[in-house]
């Protein structure tokens, strides 16, 4: 149970999930640097993606796991005769920890001031990444009278 008043550690942050040798990841970081947008880098090859972060990513995915996994994910089906779509969330998390190269990179996820995931982009696209130049619209508090 969370303590009252304790702020979510993801609140107001943008995370760029990368692998060190990924040129698309470096382009995303350059974009954020050039536009003076703050971010936190998480190298998921060195430190596995947390269960919470992975679930947040899934919650923002418009097409389930399809856009998250690279074409290499087809190898899973060939070797295990099961597709990524058939795996449970816990099985997906285990798979990503064992084989991080299956994920497309970078994964950019942005949280609002309450720590709720609001925006995500997977892969680098020079026009789509510009969405992060805009401020998140925060909900106005409801005032009861």
From Swiss-Prot:
InterPro entries: Arsenate_reductase-like (IPR006660), Thioredoxin-like_sf (IPR036249), Tscrpt_reg_Spx/MgsR (IPR006504). This is Uncharacterized protein MG127. Belongs to the ArsC family. Keywords: Disulfide bond, Oxidoreductase, Redox-active center. Gene3D superfamilies: Glutaredoxin. Disulfide bonds join 22-25. GO terms for molecular function: oxidoreductase activity. The keyword Oxidoreductase applies. SUPFAM superfamilies: Thioredoxin-like. Pfam families: ArsC. It comes from the Bacteria.
């Amino acid at each position: 149970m969370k303590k009252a008043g304790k702020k979510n550690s993801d609140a107001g942050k943008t995370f760029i999930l990368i692998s060190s040798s990924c040129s698309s990841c470096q382009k995303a970081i350059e974009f954020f640097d050039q536009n003076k947008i703050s971010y936190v880098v998480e190298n998921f090859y060195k430190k596995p993606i947390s269960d919470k972060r992975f679930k947040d990513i899934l919650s923002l995915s418009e097409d389930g796991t399809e856009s998250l996994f690279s074409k290499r994910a087809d190898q899973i089906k060939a070797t295990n005769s099961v597709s990524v779509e058939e795996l449970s969330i816990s099985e997906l998390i285990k798979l990503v920890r064992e084989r991080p190269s299956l994920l497309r990179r970078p994964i950019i996820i942005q949280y609002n001031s309450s720590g709720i995931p609001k925006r995500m982009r997977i892969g680098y696209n020079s026009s789509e990444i510009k969405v992060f130049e805009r401020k998140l619209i925060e909900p106005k508090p409801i005032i009861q009278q």
